[in-house]
Amino acid sequence: MNHSETLFEQAQKYIPGGVNSPVRAFRGVGGTPVFFKHAEGAYLYDEDDRRYIDFIGSWGPMILGHSDPRIKAALHAQVDLGVGYGAPTAIETEMAKKVCELVPSIELVRMVNSGTEATMSAIRLARGYTGRDKIVKFEGCYHGHVDSLLVKAGSGALTLGVPNSPGIPASLAEHTLTLTYNDIDEVRETFRQMGDQIAAIIVEPVAGNMNCIPPVPGFLEALREVCDEHGTVLIFDEVMTGFRVSLGGAQGFYGVKPDLTALGKVIGGGLPVGAFGGKREIMEHISPLGPVYQAGTLSGNPLAMTAGLTTLNAISEPGFHDRLTEKTNRVKDGFKAAADEAGIPLAVQSAGAMFGFFFTAEPSITRFDQVMACDVERFKAFFQGMLKEGVYLAPSAFEAGFTTAALSDEDIEFTLAAARKVMKTL
């Protein structure tokens, strides 16, 4: 029994399922989850001192790589000053200013502690601003474990086969309308029938919780159009895409501005941070300026702001995202070439520095039903094979992969050599 197996056995005695987030339990791929004790650059090291090239990056935040010296130095300096005050700090304003400068649609921003808090608060704000109750979301998109949004969700809910969680009152869920991602006609018809009742559309501009599905041409533009026509708030959930697809997020990449944006992951530099922001007219409805209540004990804490601001400054360097996207494309295209060489049907997709691959004969994946028809068993075998070779991919066929600035040419070549080897065994 290796150290991970022993630790997992112990963890299950005190933690539900042995993990603090379901996808980590390896239910989607089988076997025992790997327990890590150290990370540096592009690498993770498990409790048996085995090294893995990391394509998860803590599920997205570690865009610079692990243990970046700039982040470490900044955090050490802040720890000496104090880890939290529960009062305003100068760095909160610096962080907010930076976010407003980088994200095209954000005029005011409120810091929170997670992506779930960000989407939850954005939904409450949209309802308070419009005086309406109904929300439109899309099948397979995940917006955190918020009651009203955990309906036909992606991410860990999809991995475990429970996209509709028990514990959500029917009276609450009935206000959530779930449509088909990338189906423009369905959106238009829904708004034709009940547009004056809909407070908001919330959407992942690149769906990253049913693997990686970019928007089809015209989809985001159509959402913007129907929201403008019906006085509905358009919310982009950029928890995953923010600062990763491009410096300005998916909205900067695709040129479509939402009314509100939810942020997380990269914005915290590895610490727990979320944010939501948008048009001044809407954001001024948040307390203490307006009647929509939102608060948090640790919101804007100086440690998280320090890590986040240091990260945003680093990724603002010229050429950063171009280099990261080039690395992502090499990995994505290399996986496809390895599959073709082995005679394995595989579709690959990406947006900036996030990517996905699907074991399917279809040339591209644009909808949830296509995702569900992919060969999950073959994915499991590929995941386990790559893990044995020292490459750590997301332990679910329904999660996107991420590249980091620390990933070297040698790391990419090692990964693709492993992919060629494993593909031949499938």
Swiss-Prot record:
Catalytic activity as recorded in UniProt: (S)-4-amino-5-oxopentanoate = 5-aminolevulinate
Modified residues (N6-(pyridoxal phosphate)lysine): 265
GO cellular component terms attached to this protein's record: cytoplasm
Enzyme Commission code: 5.4.3.8
First-listed, main subcellular location of the protein, grouped into a coarse class: cytoplasm
Name this polypeptide is given: Glutamate-1-semialdehyde 2,1-aminomutase
GO molecular function, one term: glutamate-1-semialdehyde 2,1-aminomutase activity
Source species of the chain: Marinobacter nauticus (strain ATCC 700491 / DSM 11845 / VT8)
